[in-house]
UniProtKB/Swiss-Prot annotation:
Belongs to the class-I aminoacyl-tRNA synthetase family. GO terms for cellular component: aminoacyl-tRNA synthetase multienzyme complex; cytoplasm; cytoplasmic stress granule; cytosol; methionyl glutamyl tRNA synthetase complex. The gene is MES1. Changing R588 to A/K/Q: Abolishes aminoacylation activity. GO terms for biological process: glutamyl-tRNA aminoacylation; methionyl-tRNA aminoacylation. This is Methionine--tRNA ligase, cytoplasmic. The modification N-acetylserine is found at S2. ATP binds at K411.
Amino acid sequence: MSFLISFDKSKKHPAHLQLANNLKIALALEYASKNLKPEVDNDNAAMELRNTKEPFLLFDANAILRYVMDDFEGQTSDKYQFALASLQNLLYHKELPQQHVEVLTNKAIENYLVELKEPLTTTDLILFANVYALNSSLVHSKFPELPSKVHNAVALAKKHVPRDSSSFKNIGAVKIQADLTVKPKDSEILPKPNERNILITSALPYVNNVPHLGNIIGSVLSADIFARYCKGRNYNALFICGTDEYGTATETKALEEGVTPRQLCDKYHKIHSDVYKWFQIGFDYFGRTTTDKQTEIAQHIFTKLNSNGYLEEQSMKQLYCPVHNSYLADRYVEGECPKCHYDDARGDQCDKCGALLDPFELINPRCKLDDASPEPKYSDHIFLSLDKLESQISEWVEKASEEGNWSKNSKTITQSWLKDGLKPRCITRDLVWGTPVPLEKYKDKVLYVWFDATIGYVSITSNYTKEWKQWWNNPEHVSLYQFMGKDNVPFHTVVFPGSQLGTEENWTMLHHLNTTEYLQYENGKFSKSRGVGVFGNNAQDSGISPSVWRYYLASVRPESSDSHFSWDDFVARNNSELLANLGNFVNRLIKFVNAKYNGVVPKFDPKKVSNYDGLVKDINEILSNYVKEMELGHERRGLEIAMSLSARGNQFLQENKLDNTLFSQSPEKSDAVVAVGLNIIYAVSSIITPYMPEIGEKINKMLNAPALKIDDRFHLAILEGHNINKAEYLFQRIDEKKIDEWRAKYGGQQV
């Protein structure tokens, strides 16, 4: 006799019923008796067994299997009745009642399918097929190794079941390797034994201006990226900052605005805080220097220096404005630079050549407030005897700069100070708004910002926690990382460390110094005083998300030389890098997994993807290089490497040709590609989060996963059975027409 057998291809049957039917057909082919070897008819869409020479037709899968195996025993047994009455009825449900399925399939295995060993009867195989179609994961867990013929039949049956998302049940399950995630944040962050404790500071922004983009990337954003990296690595890190509020500039600005210095500081502290919140700067504490703790700690350090012989009195010539009857802070004197002859140099520094100046060095000095010619006057002041501390400072700098891998410009600037020889520097001023000098003779003077401001790091920490000394008097267990623009370097490598050394107390001192050069605006310069460039409030008004601003600023971070903000480059990077690379990779795969797998990660064998070992090698190299660069504070390079992982993910999808054809015709490979691909997205999210925390959160939300810790090795942390959420767009295309509009609108006017 000549028989043809065909698989169930009915589109009306639920996928689980179709799988059960086709598994029985496949089992029939594997277990066919010697007298009956049917041939497969792939052109027939109906499930049947028919004789091509005689009028004979069977169209029930159970009957076909019994006939082909020539085994009609057991049809009245409890086992067979359970297979039909209890299990087969479930197969006709479009939506399986999962709780009911779990109970009945477990009962089937415990009572009727205790072992799956040859010889197997037709009744055994019918029961197996029904259980497998309803709960394949249970079968695989109970029987890790299926009998050879059964294994072959399962593989064949799957090929004849059109895959659709209805066979994957998304119940929001989270199946993540827990030891690979980021630890939750402590309510109060304090150093811990046997952990890497890192104290991170950003240069304290001066309070009386809106920060521009150069200020933001030069200190707070750079520090934030590193702090988020540390926390992503599960280091024990504390990130503090605050506004620097004392000094002549505040007094004078308050006079201009007709308010008290305190009112001015309150106003601008909120402006700074709001700008940084919008930029998603994740301070653990953002404070200010106008506090009782600042007075207490600064006066303590002053007193210790005095008692140890590192302070001295000198009479100092200062510039005095005869029009508004006040001593002028260095930055409120302007004139011609004696070095480069720039006409608008300030009394403390030339914006053009960067030289540090004394106001008396300026050619034709003038009062910034009223253009009057200032007069020299003498006043007694306290000086920090840096000359007496020079050998200690030099020895410390040599050791700390090497151990802490200071950036090149940090070393160069510090060495230029040391090379010229340190001289006593004035640390008091004739002002009202400041930390009072704790000496009777000088009770009407205050501590100068050069000395006072850096102590703000300590006082701000003390306002965060009463246990602040665990951070600041704990050099054996705490590493201090500081971020700033290059103009702040001497205060952090000479003045502040000198003050710490002079107290002869056990201070936590600078370990790693990370400095930036200047970020220029288009073809000009940012300037706080002149309002040239894009400021924080302008960025908020642009309608572009803070993630894009953070990304762009990090990508042009002036690490070794000055760099430029360009509107053309800003738009191009959004469209070609964020949208076309990162956004495309994440969106394409997550949409595919939702469309084809109903958001469920299938059982997978990673070896089924093309050159899996080569892929892992590539990813491990990317991750290890990322960690290496970030540990050194090379954030610009770290971002390039992070984006290269996204590009490698796109390449991975192309290499494996992930599409509908792969899903339907090569299910095992498709399953592996989506599972491995989702884990690449998870890794991308971990290393992109320091730069764009909101994007990292969005990706993790789509993945329905907690934050993955940053590692230098690739892990398959998302496991089989994990359920993801729907895709959402991460980025939007920016119309190139906006370039000229923004260039005109944000051409340097500060609100």
